[in-house]
């Protein structure tokens, strides 16, 4: 029988990596800066595209908000693996009982959690439009699903680049370039 002898223990370790990375996002300014800048820019876009134009075309707005993923996802991922290599703590992680894929998935899950929390905060825009206009729930669900999946794709690409880069700045620059090419 092939497979892991202790799969549950590895899941616990992966969860510990997720928790550690999530704490790192909010014990340092990174998570707050990402969320704040994303919400500031999306609020400006909301004001200009929806409020000022007196429009209720939220799916188009959500689609255009996707540009922010391209610009800001490198902020979330630049430190995930490049910092481990720079601080030389990557060897400690690589010799831990968790697999390489478990380590990467734990880090990805933490970045995805921060991104998902940011997306939840943008639902306030939908509430504002619902008060003054008409919102089609199925249309919004599909728009937000695409928005979240696109953000996840950018995070995955940027995490890969962070794993290839020697430092955080290089990871961010190449991730931004790759996002631009992917877009």
Enumerate the language-model features and the residues they cover:
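Aromatic- and glycine-rich beta-strand/loop motifs that create alpha-glucan
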Residues: 9-31
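Long, hydrophobic alpha-helical segments
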Residues: 61-83, 118
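Secretory targeting signals
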Residues: 45-47, 58, 110-170
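Helix-loop-helix units of permease transmembrane domains in multi-pass membrane transporters
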Residues: 80-110
């Amino acid at each position: 029988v092939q497979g892991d002898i202790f799969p549950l223990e590895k899941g616990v370790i992966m969860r510990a990596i997720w928790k550690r990375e999530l704490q790192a996002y909010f014990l340092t300014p990174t998570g707050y800066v990402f969320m704040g800048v994303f919400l500031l820019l999306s609020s400006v876009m909301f004001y200009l595209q929806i409020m000022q134009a007196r429009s209720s075309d939220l799916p188009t707005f959500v689609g255009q908000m996707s540009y922010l993923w391209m610009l800001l996802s490198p902020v979330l991922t630049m430190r995930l693996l490049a910092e481990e290599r720079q601080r030389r703590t990557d060897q400690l992680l690589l010799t831990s009982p968790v697999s390489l894929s478990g380590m990467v998935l734990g880090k990805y899950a933490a970045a995805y959690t921060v991104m998902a929390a940011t997306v939840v905060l943008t639902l306030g825009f939908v509430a504002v439009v619902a008060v003054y206009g008409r919102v089609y729930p199925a249309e919004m669900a599909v728009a937000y699903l695409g928005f979240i999946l696109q953000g996840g794709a950018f995070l995955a690409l940027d995490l890969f680049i962070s794993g290839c880069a020697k430092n955080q700045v290089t990871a961010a620059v190449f991730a931004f370039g790759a996002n631009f090419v992917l877009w």
